[in-house]
């Protein structure tokens, strides 16, 4: 029963992340949506790892690696957003096309 609840939670978080990724024009919101997608994957790893074999912690270890990668991705993404904001004075995704002036 708990696996069903966790899978529904992960699917809803994933759908919220996809919706935010598709509809948002703000780069910060897009970055937050990507983090939601990664968190949904983490929930799935932990849920299936606990369901299949509760003694082994492979799912939790993979989840920690994903969180580490997500933290690095967020830091690099925010640094890029800050650099582009200083140049363009906006965080709108339409203004990031560097081929147009």
From Swiss-Prot:
Catalytic activity: a plastoquinone + NADH + (n+1) H(+)(in) = a plastoquinol + NAD(+) + n H(+)(out); a plastoquinone + NADPH + (n+1) H(+)(in) = a plastoquinol + NADP(+) + n H(+)(out)
Enzyme Commission number(s) from the entry: 7.1.1.-
GO biological process: ATP synthesis coupled electron transport; photosynthesis, light reaction
Keyword Chloroplast: yes
Keyword Membrane: yes
GO MF annotations, alphabetized: oxidoreductase activity, acting on NAD(P)H, quinone or similar compound as acceptor; quinone binding
GO cellular component terms given for this protein: chloroplast thylakoid membrane; NADH dehydrogenase complex
Pfam families to which the protein is assigned, alphabetical: Oxidored_q2
Major site of localization recorded for this protein: plastid
Enzyme class: translocase
Top-rank taxon: Eukaryota
Bilayer topology: Multi-pass membrane protein
Residues that span the membrane, as ranges: 2-22, 32-52, 64-84
Gene3D superfamilies registered for this protein in UniProt: 1.10.287.3510
Record's subcellular location: Plastid, Chloroplast thylakoid membrane
Annotated InterPro entries: NADH_UbQ_OxRdtase_chain4L/K, NUOK/Mnh_C1-like
Key words, A-Z: Chloroplast, Membrane, NAD, NADP, Plastid, Plastoquinone, Quinone, Thylakoid, Translocase, Transmembrane, Transmembrane helix, Transport
PANTHER family documented for this protein: NADH-UBIQUINONE OXIDOREDUCTASE CHAIN 4L, NADH-UBIQUINONE OXIDOREDUCTASE SUBUNIT ND4L
NCBIfam families given in the database record: PRK05715.1-2 (NF004320), PRK05715.1-3 (NF004321), PRK05715.1-4 (NF004322), PRK05715.1-5 (NF004323)
Similarity remark: Belongs to the complex I subunit 4L family.
Quaternary organization: NDH is composed of at least 16 different subunits, 5 of which are encoded in the nucleus.
Physiological role: NDH shuttles electrons from NAD(P)H:plastoquinone, via FMN and iron-sulfur (Fe-S) centers, to quinones in the photosynthetic chain and possibly in a chloroplast respiratory chain. The immediate electron acceptor for the enzyme in this species is believed to be plastoquinone. Couples the redox reaction to proton translocation, and thus conserves the redox energy in a proton gradient.
Protein name: NAD(P)H-quinone oxidoreductase subunit 4L, chloroplastic
Record organism: Chlorokybus atmophyticus (Soil alga)
């Amino acid at each position: 029963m708990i696996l069903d609840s966790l899978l529904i939670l992960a699917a809803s978080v994933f759908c919220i992340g996809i919706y935010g990724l598709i509809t948002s024009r703000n780069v910060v919101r897009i970055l937050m949506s990507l983090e939601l997608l990664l968190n949904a994957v983490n929930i799935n790893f932990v849920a299936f790892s606990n369901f299949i074999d509760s003694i082994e912690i492979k799912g939790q270890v993979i989840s920690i690696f994903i969180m580490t990668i997500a933290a690095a991705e967020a830091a690099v993404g925010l640094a890029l957003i800050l650099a582009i904001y200083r140049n363009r004075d906006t965080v709108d995704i339409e203004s990031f096309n560097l081929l147009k002036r």
